[in-house]
């Protein structure tokens, strides 16, 4: 529509002047974050180490879409009647789509779709971004990079044991010692059998109980008791509805959670709790077998912990969780225990949902951004960052000479750039300092006419500036810069 420039009622200038100009916010949404180069380089190094470990263990690389049909994963959402609860979803052409909240549900869909063509067991690993519509916290984001490794199509518990060894090896490549992480193991059949024995048959109530147990490290024993009962209000005032169990049921669950290792005495305690419940007894026998495989694999950095239940509902057997045992500093400057960076377990029924085919499977996941957050705080990973050489611009008329230097450096795979802008040399040197440049190249009338370059070592310059007493000392000292012939440039900066 064309503006009316000749009408008798022009728009009011006062109204136009008073109209507020919209300014979008420069903040990110809660649970999302910009990631800087240091973190991204650490991520690249970690991914490189992961790929080496996965090749050694014989896993194949796979990638699945970021979006899935919500009904493919909806059964496992916190509330399947509210597609946006727990995940980010939208309706497209009368069908609900959701951003994947993990990499396991998409893998199950992939395995069902390609069931007849895949070797079984199918050993795959994947690296990809996932999204959770949940309350964020320190090192816990709504968008994060996740790593998964899975066995599809095997009931052999050696696969479960090997996954624990695999994660342990990956954490070791991050510079973590055995004292700085632990693999906790349990079995979903123990809690499933306990729910059967206590006659907690309502599926929704079962889910609340499992999520309550899973939160023990975060909310404490008293918090779990509230979540098993009427419910719990957190520090922000948000209320989480509880399972509304009776006091006897709550007491039995708390007693079960007090068992802390896989000693013969504790196996007997669990069997006593089980009575004639075969589900619990099966879970105990599976843990005994996994413990045997750990011994064969010479893996001892694990412990039994019945509070490990894993929040997702598709687990059916052995489950495991990788925990960091050291503390980190949160945004308030407080020292907190970091806790879980990943976990997994056996999910024998997940593929069957799609094709009604028996396909026992097991897998493990690690939140890489959460792991990187921790290891960077502890300086556990050293990232080699190549700083560029800055070619300063004295005069635009010498641009051909500057480009000649640039081409020489880049043909030798040396990071270099010509300053882009109109700032003076002092400002260009400040720019180089902010970029972390170790060298700058200075070329004015003398250098161009003599086919030479002046190389300034900023690192040496910083050291000298701390020891020089006055301006005269600085002028007399030439240790931080050197003029050489053009063909000697590469020799000087190597």
What is the predicted role of each segment?
Residues 82-94, 199-230, 324-328:
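Acidic, His- and aromatic-enriched active-site or binding-groove loops in soluble protein domains
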Residues 78-80, 197-201, 456-457:
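Short secondary-structure boundary/capping segments
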Residues 42-57, 68-69, 104-116, 123-177, ...:
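Positively charged, Gly/Ser-enriched RNA/tRNA-binding surfaces
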Residues 34, 188-189, 193-200, 251:
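Phosphate-rich ligand and nucleic-acid binding surfaces
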């Amino acid at each position: 529509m064309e503006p009316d420039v000749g009408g008798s009622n022009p728009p009011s200038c006062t109204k136009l002047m008073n109209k507020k100009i919209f300014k979008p916010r420069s903040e990110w949404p809660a649970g999302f974050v910009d990631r800087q180069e240091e973190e991204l380089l650490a991520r690249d190094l970690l991914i490189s180490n992961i790929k080496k470990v996965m090749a050694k263990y014989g896993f194949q690389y796979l990638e699945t879409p970021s979006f899935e049909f919500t009904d493919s994963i909806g059964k496992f959402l916190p509330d399947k009647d509210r597609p946006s609860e727990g995940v980010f979803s939208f309706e497209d052409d009368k069908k609900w789509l959701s951003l994947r909240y993990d990499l396991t549900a998409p893998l199950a869909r992939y395995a069902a779709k390609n069931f007849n063509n895949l070797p079984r067991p199918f050993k795959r690993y994947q690296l990809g971004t996932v999204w959770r519509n949940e309350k964020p916290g320190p090192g816990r984001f709504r968008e994060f990079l996740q790593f998964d490794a899975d066995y599809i199509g095997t009931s052999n518990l050696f696969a479960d044991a090997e996954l624990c060894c695999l994660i342990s090896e990956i954490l070791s490549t991050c510079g973590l010692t055995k004292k700085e992480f632990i693999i906790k193991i349990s079995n979903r059949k123990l809690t499933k059998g306990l729910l059967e024995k206590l006659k907690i048959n309502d599926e929704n109530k079962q889910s609340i109980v499992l999520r309550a147990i899973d939160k023990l490290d975060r909310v404490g024993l008293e918090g779990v008791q509230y979540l098993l009962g009427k419910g719990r209000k957190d520090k922000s005032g948000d209320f989480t509805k509880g399972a509304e169990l009776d006091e006897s049921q709550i007491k039995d669950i708390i007693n079960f959670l007090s068992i802390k290792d896989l000693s013969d005495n504790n196996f007997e305690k669990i069997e006593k709790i089980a009575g004639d419940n075969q589900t619990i007894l099966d879970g105990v026998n599976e843990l005994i077998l996994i413990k045997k495989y750990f011994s064969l694999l010479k893996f001892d950095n694990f412990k039994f912990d019945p509070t490990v239940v894993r929040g997702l509902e598709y687990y059916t057997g052995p489950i495991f969780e990788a925990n960091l045992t050291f503390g980190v500093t949160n945004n308030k400057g407080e020292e907190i225990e970091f806790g879980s960076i990943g976990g997994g377990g056996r999910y024998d029924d997940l593929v069957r949902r799609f094709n009604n085919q028996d396909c026992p499977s097991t897998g493990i996941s690690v939140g890489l951004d959460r792991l990187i957050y921790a290891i960077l705080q502890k300086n556990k990973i050293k990232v080699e960052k190549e700083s560029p050489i800055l070619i300063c611009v004295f005069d635009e008329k010498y641009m051909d000479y500057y480009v000649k230097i640039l081409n020489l450096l880049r043909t030798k795979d040396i990071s270099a750039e010509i300053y882009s802008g109109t700032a003076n040399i002092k400002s260009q040197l400040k720019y180089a300092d902010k970029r972390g440049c170790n060298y700058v190249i200075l070329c004015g009338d003398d250098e161009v006419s003599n086919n030479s370059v002046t190389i300034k070592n900023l690192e040496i310059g910083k050291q000298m500036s701390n020891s020089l007493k006055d301006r005269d000392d600085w002028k007399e000292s030439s240790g931080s810069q050197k003029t050489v012939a053009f063909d000697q440039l590469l020799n000087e900066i190597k």
